[in-house]
């Protein structure tokens, strides 16, 4: 690995990431593949938030698992400050663990119920650093203060906390190694509405204080509008539209993006959109439709859409769109 980093090099650069899962239906059946992720590319700058949105099954959580190397991609490239993050040498593995962390969706399942909070937060330091016991405890207490947890919580168990407090613990654990990138996989969807805003505001404050970059995975577009700098809309394993938050919310172009936004409640009557009701379900990733994957549900679909797959193309405003019928 080289330490030379060009000034304009993005913090994280994903190129054509793919994840295919083999499926066997019988001894003599032809092998099939589930294309959970099929060629996703993006760049993430320091201190910015990229939101990844779409229906369940679109591949957004799979993307998060690939970025943190919980699973290895079938194909593609991933670079951190220009360094190949898919290499398996010990130096790259150690750097990966420190620089990219994840906060999972369910704070009730992501914390070990048999361990005290102090032990949960110390574990990354024990594995990845050479800090003394005193230094580890000091770092844990400092991080607990940052996320709004009192010092006396150090010796308590996860079941003693509310959902919002548990997610604060999960966020603290993700930040113990001072990462640059945090993958937040639906971090507030399992929480009560009353505490969602508190956790989101905490994440934004930590981003400002620590210079964090987020890959924010969500299906809640009202949350995305509040926190994201850029939005990537996914459908059946592919990116179909990507742009700044303002571009996506003020002028969506892909029919699927329009349908998603039409279902999002708006406070101002002037901002409300005509509701677009999609028919049918998300197609099977084992047997996706020919041409554009969205064509069976799209009111704009033509023969061209049913025969050809549109590629993601950049338009004059910088937005990326994969559709033959742009307004």
Swiss-Prot record:
Enzyme category, top tier: translocase
InterPro entries in alphabetical order: AAA+_ATPase, ABC_transp_ATP-bind, ABC_transporter-like_ATP-bd, ABC_transporter-like_CS, Oligopep_ABC_C, P-loop_NTPase
Membrane topology qualifier: Peripheral membrane protein
Binding residues for ATP: 54-61
One Pfam family matching this protein: oligo_HPY
Annotated ranges, domain ABC transporter: 12-261
An example molecular function term from Gene Ontology annotations: ATP hydrolysis activity
GO-annotated cellular components: plasma membrane
Catalysis performed (reactions): a dipeptide(out) + ATP + H2O = a dipeptide(in) + ADP + phosphate + H(+)
Superkingdom of the source species: Bacteria
Enzyme Commission (EC) number: 7.4.2.9
Record-level GO BP terms: peptide transport; protein transport; transmembrane transport
Alphabetical UniProt keywords: ATP-binding, Cell inner membrane, Cell membrane, Membrane, Nucleotide-binding, Peptide transport, Protein transport, Translocase, Transport
Coiled-coil boundaries: none
SUPFAM superfamilies: P-loop containing nucleoside triphosphate hydrolases (SSF52540)
Localization (cell): Cell inner membrane
Family to which this protein belongs: Belongs to the ABC transporter superfamily.
Entry-linked NCBIfam families: oligo_HPY (TIGR01727), PRK11308.1 (NF008453)
Function: Part of the ABC transporter DppBCDF involved in dipeptide transport. Responsible for energy coupling to the transport system.
Name assigned to this protein: Dipeptide transport ATP-binding protein DppF
Source organism of the structure: Haemophilus influenzae (strain ATCC 51907 / DSM 11121 / KW20 / Rd)
